[in-house]
């Protein structure tokens, strides 16, 4: 490719080599850049020969420009190079790349304007439509194309998916290309649900608009004819400008790009939002010691996009920070690549760097370079070795701090603290040893920064207990338990290297907890030695072994064996580390804490500790001391006012004790959590796996940190015996057992931790429920166990241990109460107790065991056992077993004698579910894929209503099994049901409440399900017709039931202790008893009709059971319901017959009036039921029979929760006329009027009329020109009304008025034929809506509701004034149990016989005779020795 040098002539080449790559930079363009550019062009399939001319360069730039926004850094570099080359060809003088890009942009703008001018002059009608909302039409006018739904959809999708991550900004910029302010507001409206983000955006836009107004003051005097006014800040934001004005400004000559300006403001706001959602700074992005370079680069660029900086600054960040913040291993490689390395080269070079594998390779290489393996090494061998020097000031290699040109870094170069220089620094290597032990005579120094780091949940650390020959526990005892969090430590983000003193020489050595021995590089040590061979990563090396050698590490001494030989690095091994008391500590967990809050308005628990026995106090002190050492709890002082009781119980079948904290009070006060897992996993859903392991996470909750701000609320106190000393106070640092938030936070944290492992190993199945883990794979057992170890290490890195004790490697596996075998599963063995007498608690436990067993043992029944538990009984109450329950229990014992197993799920086969009827409303089912190999079994015995039939129960059972199958396997089974298709069809077609059931087939398993009787669809010709009715008096409970027939027969019976519903059923029973084999029955009871139409064959009601018996005996029965009895003679007669002396009000009288009212006003059913005292079913029937009310169904009247003074206004159009609608948001009350024109004058007049009738505080409108006019603003100012608009100035939607517009139009449609003019119909519709439709809050009409809201508001304000006055009083009171006066408490309410007070957070009612009310005169009232102050101190 050397031929590419011909691109430039000699003179041009000179110019080329004078142009700088960056403004103010040292590097300049060279020939190699042209060669590189030609190679890159070939990669992109562009002819490199185009570089030789300016026209060719222009074509290349045109090709590359669209890719700049989405392209890589290489494309940007190529574009910059070609742009500079174009300037050299065109003989345009430029000093650097930036100038060249500016010149190119200038030229492009000129050519664009020229092209537009030419197009305008020639009236070019065939112009291709650009992707901008403003285009030129055939007449040459600039018209607006609204932003497309597709664009809006893309914008909503990116916000929902990315949640304001940095990618949102370029996406918004691309989608909003050329948009008008109105389009931009539409885009913001679509994501208006993100209230916090929109509020921030609104503030930014307000600031920018104010700044625009400040920089562009309004010119004095009138605007010249033909000229446009200059836009204000609010015009640019689209609030006070029309679309035509916006188009005018954007297409004017010269143009004012209001769209681009507004877009820039929005992007500024989006930047702030992104910073809020992605708070990490680019300076904080550092590569972890074992983090792959690729992951680090991803994080780096993601954060870089969120930075608010120019492209130049971002380029500089990429060049410097990317390398600078890499870990030491990657940094060495990146520096070796040189400054001009591409990202691709960097990622290739750093592939596989980091972690133990990399360490092994480095050590192997280092050891292979050690040529001399002689036992004795001469000093001369080290003469020419030069150590690389590194500057303390700037951190660069090659010079020392004395010669450094960089500005001097503040403070000490060693420890980073200000106030001293490095030569005076008393710090040792990373404060490695405890100061009070390293320097016993000296004064211990502060460890503030180290302590902070020790408590940090994100650090890994190596910690030392400095001691002589004490054990760690003894040392801890000597220091009175102060060990835990005051230990110095060194984090493992860098290699733990310390300075050691051995044989009078100072050396640097690596602390290696993985090395058994201490190995030092060649040096002379006193005493005898013996030769030895030791194995290293690179093979075996010969060393000299010296025994009893004294080593001093930072002033602390240890004596042990030291090996001397050709090691690439000095290593202090475990033989000396154990003497020093060095421990490798895993912090609690480096995962992020989940923020937790108390419920609004609540404070933490303040429950007193109850007395404990001496034994329990000792146990608790012991447990808490151990927990404190482990960092699970910390001591707190008296400044923490919260407390929760603590106690201890003995563990089951053990002498060990267990600490329990009664968190009931804290649980009441803690926010609610969404339970991450909605149920437990089931073994039938497990796929058969070749290898399986079950793990248990040890101390699960104690491995997850608790939110720091919430810890104070978990405080508890261990009391002392006889109050000898103040109690010891602790608070939790981790998730406590028994606290309501622990399960949800633990499960969420565990899921996050397992996510990367699941992604890396998609073939491994991990079922996670709390601390139980089931891991299955199809790997060979050896590979599987390797993966298990990887998983255990992965969990360990996050602070979760998996104890060997609960690590199950071989089957059967005990998991979640199940027993898992390689090809089958069962429940863990179940033993039913043998008892002579059964208590309520015993039966509850028995039912629980049987329910658990029923998932694999088919045929288990518990209905009769459950009947024993009906009613409220004490747990210890003895219950005799009924004969049925005895029999049921005996059957269950027989079933459980034979062990039954389930098989595992095979995704390639279909699921089949088979149901059998067991009688007495009990059903059993099996789910399988192959016959006789059940996945799981179960039972169903629930009666959803008092009256049911087998078909209905069968449907409910099928739906239960379907739901269960979807949860376990994610699909529905095919059903085999004991019911014939004809029976099912006969019931299903008539019974409208039957819901969907999946695919099924008939299986002839007795007993079959059948319908015992069927109701006729049409009246039976020739059969006697019975008009039945019943009535009861609510007070006396006396009633009558009877019938009248079309053949003149009649009968009435008197009833006692009855209800209206019972009498109606009794009447039907009479009719059935006294009729032949065929009968027509007419009733006015919707209740009775509902029961019988469902064709029940069993019922808990004796009366309904008797009716069922009668129905089964009949050949044909027709049952009808008549809502309006008038006109049906039989019904009128029977009404008079049964209601004599019984009914107080007959609802039938109101039906006619209600129907008349509905024909006029089309009132909804609630209004009619309320006004005419009708039963809801009758009122609904009247609405249902009205053809005009069935067009769009019943309107929903849900209310928006808003303050009483807010109204929404909008204009809607009907029949070519304009209707101005105002809605009172809180009540739904409407004011509407037909206005002659949509002008500011008419709108202002309407608003003033509205303000004269109702208290209007705020009006909320859209950005229509009539609402934004100065006339309306003046009217609002005069009436003291605040005006609000849509986004961005107020994110509240126009939803209420929009829905009311539709509702109003619907009502107008119902009454339009009653009025000649539309304005009359509008007022009729307003009247109907406000006073004839009830529903929503309080069941009122809108008119009643607005009056109620305003009245309540006035009362509340008055009450508030009184409350404010009453709160100035304090109350001293006496409890009934204690003679001492308590207080002072706050007075909340004062009644005739009692007062309501608030003492701390408790609200109490105290009788007046036990309360003294005084005015709050301030603190001086309570003297030092007054009763109140003494009480507080206690």
Swiss-Prot record:
The modification Phosphotyrosine is found at residue 132. Residues 277-363 are annotated as: Dimerization/Multimerization of capsid protein p24. Residues 7-31 are annotated as: Interaction with Gp41. Mg(2+) 1 binds at residues 696, 771-772. A motif (Nuclear localization signal) lies at residues 26-32. Residues 630-820 form the Reverse transcriptase domain. It catalyses: Specific for a P1 residue that is hydrophobic, and P1' variable, but often Pro; Endohydrolysis of RNA in RNA/DNA hybrids. Three different cleavage modes: 1. sequence-specific internal cleavage of RNA. Human immunodeficiency virus type 1 and Moloney murine leukemia virus enzymes prefer to cleave the RNA strand one nucleotide away from the RNA-DNA junction. 2. RNA 5'-end directed cleavage 13-19 nucleotides from the RNA end. 3. DNA 3'-end directed cleavage 15-20 nucleotides away from the primer terminus; 3'-end directed exonucleolytic cleavage of viral RNA-DNA hybrid; DNA(n) + a 2'-deoxyribonucleoside 5'-triphosphate = DNA(n+1) + diphosphate. The record marks 132-133, 363-364, 376-377, 431-432, 439-440, 487-488, 586-587, 1026-1027, 1146-1147 as: Cleavage. GO terms for cellular component: host cell; host cell nucleus; host cell plasma membrane; host multivesicular body; membrane; viral nucleocapsid; virion membrane. The keyword Protein transport does not apply. Residues 73-77 are annotated as: Interaction with membrane phosphatidylinositol 4,5-bisphosphate. Residues 507-576 form the Peptidase A2 domain. Binds 2 magnesium ions for reverse transcriptase polymerase activity. Binds 2 magnesium ions for ribonuclease H (RNase H) activity. Substrate-binding is a precondition for magnesium binding. Zn(2+) binds at residues 1158, 1162, 1186, 1189. Coiled coil: none annotated. Its EC number is 3.4.23.16, 2.7.7.49, 2.7.7.7, 3.1.26.13. SMART domains: ZnF_C2HC. A lipid is attached at residue 2 (N-myristoyl glycine). The record marks 221-222 as: Cis/trans isomerization of proline peptide bond. Residues 1020-1143 form the RNase H type-1 domain. A motif (Tryptophan repeat motif) lies at residues 984-1000. Residues 12-19 are annotated as: Interaction with host AP3D1. InterPro entries: Aspartic_peptidase_AS (IPR001969), DNA/RNA_pol_sf (IPR043502), Gag_p24_C (IPR045345), Integrase-like_N (IPR017856), Integrase_C_dom_sf_retrovir (IPR036862), Integrase_C_retrovir (IPR001037), Integrase_cat-core (IPR001584), Integrase_Zn-bd_dom_N (IPR003308). Residues 106-128, 443-480 are annotated as: Disordered. This is Gag-Pol polyprotein. It comes from Human immunodeficiency virus type 1 group M subtype B (isolate OYI) (HIV-1).
């Amino acid at each position: 490719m050397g031929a590419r040098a011909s691109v430039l002539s000699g003179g041009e080449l000179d110019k080329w080599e004078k142009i700088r790559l960056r403004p103010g930079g040292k590097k300049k363009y060279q020939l190699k850049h042209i060669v590189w550019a030609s190679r890159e062009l070939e990669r992109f399939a562009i002819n490199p020969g185009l570089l030789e001319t300016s026209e060719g360069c222009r074509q290349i730039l045109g090709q590359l420009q669209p890719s700049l926004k989405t392209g890589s850094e290489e494309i940007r570099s190529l574009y910059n190079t070609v742009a500079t080359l174009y300037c050299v060809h065109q003989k345009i003088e430029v000093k650097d790349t930036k100038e060249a890009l500016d010149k190119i942009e200038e030229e492009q703008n000129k050519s664009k304007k020229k092209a537009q001018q030419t197009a305008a002059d020639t009236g070019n009608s065939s112009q291709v439509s650009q992707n901008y909302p403003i285009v030129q039409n055939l007449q040459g006018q600039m018209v607006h194309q609204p932003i497309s739904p597709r664009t809006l959809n893309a914008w909503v999708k990116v916000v929902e998916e990315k949640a304001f991550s940095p990618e949102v900004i370029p996406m918004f910029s691309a989608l909003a290309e050329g948009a008008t302010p109105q389009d931009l507001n539409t885009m913001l409206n679509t994501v208006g649900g993100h209230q916090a983000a929109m509020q921030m955006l609104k503030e930014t836009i307000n600031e920018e608009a104010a700044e625009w107004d400040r920089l562009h003051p309004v010119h004095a005097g009138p605007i010249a004819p033909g000229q446009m006014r200059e836009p204000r800040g609010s015009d640019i934001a689209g609030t006070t400008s029309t679309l035509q004005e916006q188009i005018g400004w954007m297409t004017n000559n010269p143009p004012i790009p209001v769209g681009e300006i507004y877009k820039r403001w929005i992007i500024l706001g989006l930047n702030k939002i992104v910073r809020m959602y992605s708070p990490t700074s680019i300076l904080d992005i550092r590569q972890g010691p074992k983090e792959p370079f690729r992951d680090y680069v991803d994080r780096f660029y993601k954060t870089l996009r969120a930075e608010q900086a120019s492209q130049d600054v971002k380029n500089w960040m990429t060049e410097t920070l990317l390398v600078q913040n890499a870990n030491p291993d990657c940094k060495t490689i990146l520096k070796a690549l040189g400054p001009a390395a591409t990202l691709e080269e960097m990622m290739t070079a750093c592939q596989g760097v980091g972690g133990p594998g990399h360490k092994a390779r480095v050590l192997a290489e280092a050891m292979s370079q050690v040529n001399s393996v002689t036992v004795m090494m001469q000093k001369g061998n080290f003469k020419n070795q030069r150590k690389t020097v590194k500057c303390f000031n700037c951190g660069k290699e090659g010079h020392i701090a004395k010669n450094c040109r960089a500005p001097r870094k503040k403070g000490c170069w060693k420890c980073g603290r200000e106030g001293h220089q490095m030569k005076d620094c008393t710090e040792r290597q990373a404060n490695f040893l405890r100061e009070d032990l390293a320097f016993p005579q000296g004064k211990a120094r502060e460890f503030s920064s180290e302590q902070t780091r020790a408590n940090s949940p994100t650090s890994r650390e190596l910690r030392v207990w400095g001691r002589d020959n004490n054990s760690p526990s003894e040392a801890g005892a000597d220091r009175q338990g102060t060990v835990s969090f005051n230990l110095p430590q060194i984090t493992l983000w860098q290699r733990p290297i310390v300075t050691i003193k051995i044989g009078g020489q100072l050396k640097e050595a690596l602390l290696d907890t993985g090395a058994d021995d201490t190995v030092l590089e060649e040096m002379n040590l006193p005493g005898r030695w013996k030769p030895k061979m030791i194995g290293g990563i690179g093979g075996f090396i010969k060393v000299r072994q010296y025994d009893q050698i004294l080593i001093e590490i930072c002033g602390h001494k240890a004596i042990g064996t030291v090996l001397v030989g050709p090691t690439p690095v000095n290593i202090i091994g475990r033989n000396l580390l154990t003497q020093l008391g060095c421990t490798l500590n895993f912090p609690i967990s480096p995962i992020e804490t989940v923020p937790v809050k108390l419920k609004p308005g609540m404070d933490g628990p303040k429950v007193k500790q109850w007395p404990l026995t001496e034994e329990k106090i000792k146990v608790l002190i012991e447990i808490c001391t151990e927990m404190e050492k482990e960092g699970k709890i910390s001591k707190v002082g008296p400044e923490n006012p919260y407390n929760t009781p603590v106690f201890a119980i003995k563990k089951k079948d053990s002498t060990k004790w267990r600490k329990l904290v009664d968190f009931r009070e804290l649980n009441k006060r803690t926010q609610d959590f969404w339970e991450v897992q909605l149920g437990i996993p089931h073994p039938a859903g497990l796929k058969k796996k070749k290898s399986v392991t079950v793990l248990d996470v040890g101390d699960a909750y104690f491995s997850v940190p608790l939110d720091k701000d919430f810890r104070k609320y978990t405080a508890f106190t261990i009391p002392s015996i006889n109050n000898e000393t103040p109690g010891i106070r602790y608070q939790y640092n981790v998730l406590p057992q028994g606290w309501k938030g622990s399960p949800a936070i633990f499960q969420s944290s565990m899921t996050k931790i397992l996510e990367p492992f699941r992604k890396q190993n998609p073939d491994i199945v991990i079922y996670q429920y709390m601390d139980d883990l089931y891991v299955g794979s199809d790997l060979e057992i050896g590979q599987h166990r390797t993966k298990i170890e990887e998983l255990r290490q992965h969990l360990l890195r996050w602070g979760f241990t998996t104890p060997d004790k609960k690590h199950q490697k071989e089957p059967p596996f005990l998991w979640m109460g199940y027993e898992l075998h390689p090809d089958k599963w069962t429940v863990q063995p179940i033993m039913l107790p043998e008892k002579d007498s059964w208590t309520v608690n015993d039966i509850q436990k028995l039912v629980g065991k049987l329910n658990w067993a029923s998932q694999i043992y088919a045929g288990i029944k518990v209905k009769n056992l459950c009947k024993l538990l009906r009613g409220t009984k004490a747990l210890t109450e003895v219950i005799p077993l009924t004969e049925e329950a005895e029999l049921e229990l005996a059957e269950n014992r027989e079933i459980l004698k034979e062990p039954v197993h389930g098989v595992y799920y095979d995704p390639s086969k279909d699921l089949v579910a088979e149901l059998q009827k067991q009688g007495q409303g009990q059903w059993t089912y099996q789910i399988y894929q192959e016959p006789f190999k059940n996945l799981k079994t179960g039972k169903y015995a629930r009666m959803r209503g008092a009256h049911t039939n087998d078909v209905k129960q069968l449907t409910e059972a099928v739906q239960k099994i379907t739901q269960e199958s979807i949860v376990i396997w994610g699909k529905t089974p095919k059903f085999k049901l004991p019911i014939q298709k004809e029976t099912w069809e006969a019931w299903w077609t008539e019974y409208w409440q039957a819901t969907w059931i999946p695919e099924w087939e008939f299986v002839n398993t007795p007993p079959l399900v059948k319908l015992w009787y069927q109701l006729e669809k049409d009246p039976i010709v020739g059969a006697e017709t019975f008009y039945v009715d019943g009535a009861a008096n609510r007070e006396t409970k006396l009633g009558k039931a009877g019938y009248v027939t079309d053949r003149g027969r009649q009968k009435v019976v008197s009833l006692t202790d009855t209800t209206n519903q019972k009498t109606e059923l009794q009447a039907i029973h009479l009719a059935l008893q006294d009729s032949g084999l065929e009968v027509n029955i007419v009733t006015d009871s919707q209740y009775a009709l509902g029961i019988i139409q469902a064709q029940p064959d069993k019922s808990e009601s004796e009366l309904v059971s008797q009716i069922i018996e009668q129905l089964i005996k009949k050949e044909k029965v027709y049952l009808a319901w008549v809502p309006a009895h008038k006109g049906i003679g039989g019904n009128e007669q029977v009404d008079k017959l049964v209601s004599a002396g019984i009914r107080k009000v007959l609802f039938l009288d109101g039906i006619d009036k209600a129907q008349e009212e509905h024909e006029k006003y089309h009132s909804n059913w609630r209004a009619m039921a309320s006004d005419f005292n009708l039963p809801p079913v009758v009122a609904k029937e009247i609405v249902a029979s009205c053809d005009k009310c069935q067009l769009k169904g019943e309107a929903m009247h849900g209310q928006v929760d808003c303050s009483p003074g807010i109204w929404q206004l909008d204009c809607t159009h009907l029949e070519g006329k304009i209707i101005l609608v105002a809605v009172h948001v809180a009540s739904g009350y409407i004011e509407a009027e037909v206005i002659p024109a949509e002008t500011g004058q008419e709108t202002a007049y309407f608003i003033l009329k509205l303000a004269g009738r109702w208290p209007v505080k705020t009006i909320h409108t859209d950005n229509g020109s009539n609402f934004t006019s100065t006339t309306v603003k003046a009217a609002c100012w005069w009436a003291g009304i605040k005006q609000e608009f849509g986004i961005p100035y107020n994110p509240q939607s126009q939803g209420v008025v929009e829905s009311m517009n539709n509702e109003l139009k619907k009502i107008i449609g119902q009454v339009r034929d009653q009025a000649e003019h539309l304005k009359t119909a509008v007022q009729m519709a307003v009247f109907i809506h406000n006073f004839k439709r009830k529903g929503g809050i309080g069941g009122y009409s809108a008119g009643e509701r607005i009056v109620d809201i305003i009245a309540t508001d006035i009362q509340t304000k008055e009450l508030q004034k009184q409350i404010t006055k009453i709160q100035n009083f304090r109350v001293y009171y006496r409890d009934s149990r204690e003679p001492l006066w308590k207080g002072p408490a706050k007075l909340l309410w004062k009644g005739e016989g009692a007062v309501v007070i608030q003492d701390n957070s408790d609200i109490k009612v105290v009788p007046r005779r036990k309360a003294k009310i005084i005015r709050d005169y301030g603190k001086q009232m309570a003297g030092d020795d007054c009763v109140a102050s003494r009480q507080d101190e206690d």
